């Protein structure tokens, strides 16, 4: 009888049937706030969107962050994060990078932060060309766990360690990697000239 009363109260909205899970907020800004001060051309800024994403972080708690990406990839990115959340694949944080600087000494190094849009040059190349991150068409996941390893042995970010046995690390056997590839993304861990384990990119349709 007691269970039946509780169920009726829950259905009436008087007594919660299941206590809502507390979500840790890592980022909660508008697109304008995320892009404030960027040196990107206006046509690039106009092509971007922001998405709220949820993920389990390394503390085991559910977090909510944000990703700025090209607007045509918004639903793709939301789906990818939903997949990682359901897989309990840990993400350190997802906070928009709100300044234009090289990777060294910024979000990648200090926060192990996952992100998409970042108006910058390619950090793994010396030719000075723009990264696809400059257009929000790539996403980096847990850079410390999934660093870029150049042909000369240099690791970016400095201090990053690639160990497949550590949670939050991407590998060719990872369901996360397989899901990205299934939906048309290219993974930097499959490159031959260098290994960029954190990196996924996708050409626009």
Task: Describe each region flagged by the PLM.
Residues 186-205:
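Basic/polar, cationic surfaces and motifs that engage anionic cell-wall
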Residues 22-190:
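Cell-envelope/glycan interface and biosynthesis
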Residues 15-16, 146:
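Residues in and immediately flanking transmembrane alpha helices
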Residues 18-20:
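Boundary at the C-terminal end of the N-terminal hydrophobic targeting segment
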Residues 4-14:
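Sec-dependent N-terminal signal peptides
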